[in-house]
From Swiss-Prot:
Its cofactor is Mg(2+). Reversibly transfers an adenylyl group from ATP to 4'-phosphopantetheine, yielding dephospho-CoA (dPCoA) and pyrophosphate. NCBIfam families: coaD_prev_kdtB, cyt_tran_rel. Substrate binds at residues 11, 43, 76, 90. GO terms for biological process: coenzyme A biosynthetic process. This is Phosphopantetheine adenylyltransferase. The gene is coaD. InterPro entries: Cyt_trans-like, PPAT, Rossmann-like_a/b/a_fold. It is found in: Cytoplasm. GO terms for cellular component: cytoplasm. It is an enzyme of class 2 (transferase). Gene3D superfamilies: HUPs.
Length: 167
């Protein structure tokens, strides 16, 4: 029987508890989940590719069928095909996410009809969570521990200054 391999692509800058929740749920559905740190050409990343991989790996260490990989600059479906993945995981927080992700899923299906996009609805506690908001909160010294895994929290404060600790 063929292994069911899924890719969960994203810029993960930073990797959040919402991302982690999606990965945990996907890990129960698939034999292997590859968290693919992608390059988003429209964003200036806070973390390097190597830092993202380390943070994702630390955050998912308790999930034996999950691994983090850096995806080269190419289409996500091409990356998925190159590692034998037949499923692409996308987390959906709200209606706006669904519209955007449905459009991408349609294009991905046109590019490779063998790769299915699977939408996982975010737990309601994560539906307003975004990497951008988390970086903003951390930059102004806000407490982000409930929004990100512990390794990411430490890395955020190290990158953005430890304003939270001085309060």
């Amino acid at each position: 029987m063929t292994k069911k391999i899924a890719v969960f692509p994203g810029s993960f800058d930073p990797f959040t508890n919402g991302h982690l929740d999606t990965v945990k749920r996907a890990s129960r559905l698939f034999d292997e989940v590859v968290v693919a740190a992608m390059t988003n050409t429209s964003k200036k990343p806070l973390f390097s590719s190597e830092e993202k991989l380390a943070l994702i790996s630390e955050s998912t260490a308790g999930l034996p069928n999950v691994k983090a990989m850096a995806a080269p600059k190419r289409l996500t479906v091409e990356f998925a095909r190159s590692i034998g993945a037949r499923f692409m995981i996308r987390g959906i927080r709200n209606v706006a996410d669904f519209g955007y992700e449905a459009d991408i899923a349609t294009v991905n299906h046109d590019l490779d009809p063998e790769i299915e996009t699977v939408f996982l609805l975010a737990d309601k506690q994560y539906d307003a969570l975004s990497s951008t908001i988390i970086k903003e909160v951390a930059a102004f010294g806000g407490d982000v521990h409930r929004f990100v895994p512990a390794p990411v929290e430490a890395a955020l404060y190290a990158k953005l200054g430890d304003a939270h600790q001085t309060k």
